[in-house]
């Protein structure tokens, strides 16, 4: 009986882990407080800083399947843990 109970606990933990989804910040401001749950296949949080004109910066944050590319004068940081793209 104890073996059956232990087996059920292990199976439950494994099944719950398969349903894990990443949570990333998602807003265009420097100081962000909005979160989004990433879709299936999106395993990366990113923060992209675009320099549009001198002294004009644009922040982009969100989820992605792969780390986004950059243009000259852009910076991108990618990570893979919850809310890591601050």
From Swiss-Prot:
GO cellular component annotations, sorted alphabetically? Answer: extracellular region
Keyword Nucleotide-binding part of the UniProt annotation: no
Question: What SUPFAM superfamilies does this protein map onto?
Answer: Snake toxin-like (SSF57302)
UniProt entry keywords in alphabetical sequence = Acetylcholine receptor inhibiting toxin, Disulfide bond, Ion channel impairing toxin, Neurotoxin, Postsynaptic neurotoxin, Secreted, Signal, Toxin
Keyword set includes Ion transport = no
UniProt xrefs under InterPro entries: Snake_3FTx, Snake_toxin-like_sf, Snake_toxin_con_site, Toxin_cobra-type
Which GO molecular function annotation, any one, does this entry have?
ion channel regulator activity
Q: Which PROSITE patterns match?
A: SNAKE_TOXIN
Q: Which residues form the signal peptide?
A: 1-21
Classify the main location.
Answer: secreted
Entry's localization field:
Secreted
Any idea what job this protein has?
Binds with low affinity to muscular and very low affinity to neuronal (alpha-7/CHRNA7) nicotinic acetylcholine receptor (nAChR).
Q: What is this protein called?
A: Weak neurotoxin 5
Organism of this sequence = Naja sputatrix
Question: Which lineage ranks, top first, belong to the organism behind this chain?
Answer: Eukaryota, Metazoa, Chordata, Craniata, Vertebrata
